[in-house]
């Protein structure tokens, strides 16, 4: 009889933690890499250590390589006004959808994906006007656009895609862009259209 309270306590703790588990992150059903390559402007992102010098005008340039990888060139403006550039590679992890990639910026006698990060394409706008990218652990997320400013209706769609995947949109911060949003404010605190 002494074990009944202990059993009930363990059961309640396990039940509560099971309810708190988030559903797995899912990707789009397919990505046409020919449509995806090109220049993307960072509209909002979860701040990362590798972007700590960046103050705005952050872009990513993607191109296909002869080895069926994606060349990645990220650039941003620093506080001093200089351009910071990082080159990397992405390999396709799920060739049936092209929606899961592994990105690395480590090159030593070849690109080292062991140190790479998950780059999952979670949502795409019509004609690839925007992309929502994240990681399965929800520690990384970006809203990317083909233009420095994303129309309010498209920003709303992209934000909703993150919310439906249980990302905390307060963790995403707007990236200042010339011709776009100018303040580093949380995505969740900024009314759509400002």
Identify the residue ranges that each predicted region occupies.
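A beta-rich soluble binding module of mature secreted/lumenal proteins
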Residues: 3-194
């Amino acid at each position: 009889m002494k074990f009944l309270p202990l059993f009930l306590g363990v059961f309640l703790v396990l039940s509560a933690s099971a309810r708190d588990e988030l559903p797995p992150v899912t990707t789009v059903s397919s990505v046409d890499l020919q449509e995806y390559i090109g220049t993307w402007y960072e509209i909002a992102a979860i701040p990362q250590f590798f972007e700590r010098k960046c103050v705005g005008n952050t872009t990513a340039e993607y191109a296909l390589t002869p080895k069926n990888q994606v060349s990645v060139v990220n650039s941003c403006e620093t506080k001093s006004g200089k351009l910071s550039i990082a080159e990397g590679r992405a390999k396709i992890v799920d060739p049936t959808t092209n929606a899961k990639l592994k990105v690395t910026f480590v090159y030593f006698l070849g690109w080292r994906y062991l140190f790479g990060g998950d780059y999952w394409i979670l949502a795409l706008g019509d004609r690839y006007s925007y992309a929502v990218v994240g990681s399965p652990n929800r520690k990384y997320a970006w809203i990317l656009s083909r233009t420095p400013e994303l129309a309010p209706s498209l920003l709303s769609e992209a934000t909703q895609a993150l919310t439906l995947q249980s990302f905390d949109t307060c963790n995403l911060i707007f990236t200042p862009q010339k011709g776009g949003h100018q303040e580093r404010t949380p995505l969740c605190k900024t009314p759509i259209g400002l």
